[in-house]
Amino acid sequence: MRLVDNDLDVRRARVDVTQKELADAVNVTRQTINAIERGRYDPSLELAFALADFFGCDIEDIFNPETDLELS
């Protein structure tokens, strides 16, 4: 299974927001944010846009399809 690499945890730390606060802002659970940060879940396009909007950046700034992660 391939997952897209991301720097969501780094961006979240820069703005001093907890996983719960971010989850509430984009209408998902804290567990979803945790799974994305750990590379265990790829967000839907809708969620990716919501995250980018929250951080005021482009989707590509958070999610890097050039560095896919390989899960066994």
How would you describe each model-predicted region?
Residues 1-14:
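A short, Lys/Arg-rich alpha-helix, primarily the initiator
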Residues 53, 63-72:
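Short, charged recognition helix plus adjacent turn
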